[in-house]
Amino acid sequence: MSDSTPLPPVRLPSEAELARDALATPLLSRAARLARWAGPDTRVDSGGGLVEEQLAAAAEALGLTGRSAEGGADAGAVTDAEAAEEAQAEASEAWRAAVDTGLVEVLDEEEGTVRAGDNLALLTSGSPAEVLHIWLDALDAAIADASVPDFDDLMDVMDEGGEIDFSSLDWDPQAEAEFLEGVLANLYLLTADERAPEGAPVPLPALAASVVVPSDVAEPTDAMMEEVSTAMMRLDDQFRILAPTGLADFRPVDESLLIEEGQAAPQTPDDEPEDLERYGVVRLTPLGLYGLRARLLDAGYAAPALGDLAGKGADALLDGTVHYGPLAARAETEQWLARREPLAAARELLAAARGGDADAPLRRLHCQQALSLVGTEAEPALREVLDDPELGGLARVWLAEHGAADIPAPSQELVFWLTVDTVAAQLAAEGNSEELVALVEGLAAQHSGFFDTAWRVDHPATAEVLEAMGRLHPDKRIAKEARKAAYKARSQQAG
């Protein structure tokens, strides 16, 4: 994923709603409870972790004692000792989150004493943005923890002096972090894609395959599928760690599918939804979408949210929505128009649509689409540009669609210029789509001698459009005519 190409825009709830969601997450709510529970007798070890002797009391303060802490499907099969151990582990994680987010501060490292951190008060008196900043710190820490090997693996490589021999681990910290970051980025993209059903969960095997199998591979090899299975189990462990942050709704891999040493059954899941769900599914929450977007922005990616452009000028709107899908572009435009008077908005859009740069045709297409959302109050603005060589064509289209009278007939030069501009915009928006192929066929069929005139059109994209028509038209004779016309257009531009 390139950090220069804008990501699809996402629709986010308000900061107030997101902050409420953050406060309700298991990890942050437990961290806050432990921060308030801590007192003068609370002690931490050299790493800031709660001392082992106080874990049971911390678990009790969180209400995690008794049955299995999470109360899962197999809770009845868990012994009291196992339940207590699990509860203490979750209490330890919550305490670590309290320290990582500044809800608790270590007063004296030698004595192991603590006090409430300054951020604790912000959870109740701070702004939504301040609450979300605290939650983001918890998320960052959880993502870092999820990239670290399992504790049992660390114990296996501990030497006699109690030091961990990291060289004995089959673990590359950077590669592990990059793997998880890649998975989370792909989950973000899958969630942001407007073609995907809203709120649809992503099967864990598909998510694993997205970072293992190259995009240009149609049929994965057996070795690739084995790697997907291994990656799926890594993700199962990692999302178990991340789920309490509220990042995602997660259904783990069905334990009946697991065989010795914690590996998944090798067979590929069927396409039936019930079967896929047994292999684990994950759905990014609105809070998770917000969190991953914040991380992507920090990493330098262009990760827009719907509404970002509503307060900016028309030039920012038309340039910004160039890479949006049609639904997102319309939603962004509706928010932009809602803040403006129709006539003033139309004039601003038309002024921003001018230009001879490579993005200008798509900008004019988006201008035309935006103007379709404006009522007849905008008519004076459209009449003002009827003689404009770049805008006169779309102005006539708008006036005709709105039933206006006294629309001057366009010149042949304007008709052909608008045709080239329209095809150039469609090329930029859709590439070689079926709709564009149909448009190309229709143009060649409707206009006798089309190519004899088209190559003379004074438009920066004339040669590119004619080359595309030669590439897309199914009739070899007509395609050859288009290529010849493109050559003439190139020669004319060079001269």
PLM regions with names:
Residues 1-103, 109-134, 146-224:
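Short, amphipathic alpha-helical interface elements at domain boundaries
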Residues 92-94, 101, 105-177, 230-240, ...:
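Accessory beta->alpha helical hairpin/"wing" motif in late/C-terminal subdomains of nucleic-acid enzymes
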Residues 239-241, 314-315, 343-354, 375-386, ...:
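Amphipathic alpha-helical scaffolding segments comprising HEAT/armadillo-like alpha-solenoid repeats
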Residues 253, 308-309, 316-321, 348-358, ...:
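Alpha-solenoid HEAT/Armadillo-like helical repeat scaffolds in large eukaryotic proteins
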Residues 281, 299-333:
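Charged, amphipathic alpha-helical linkers/stalks
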Residues 281, 357-360, 387-392, 458-459, ...:
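Short inter-helical turns and helix N-cap capping residues of alpha-solenoid HEAT/ARM repeat scaffolds
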Residues 319-323, 330-340, 362-373, 384, ...:
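Structural detector for internal amphipathic alpha-helices that build alpha-solenoid repeat scaffolds
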Residues 335-337, 397-450:
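Alpha-helical adaptor scaffolds
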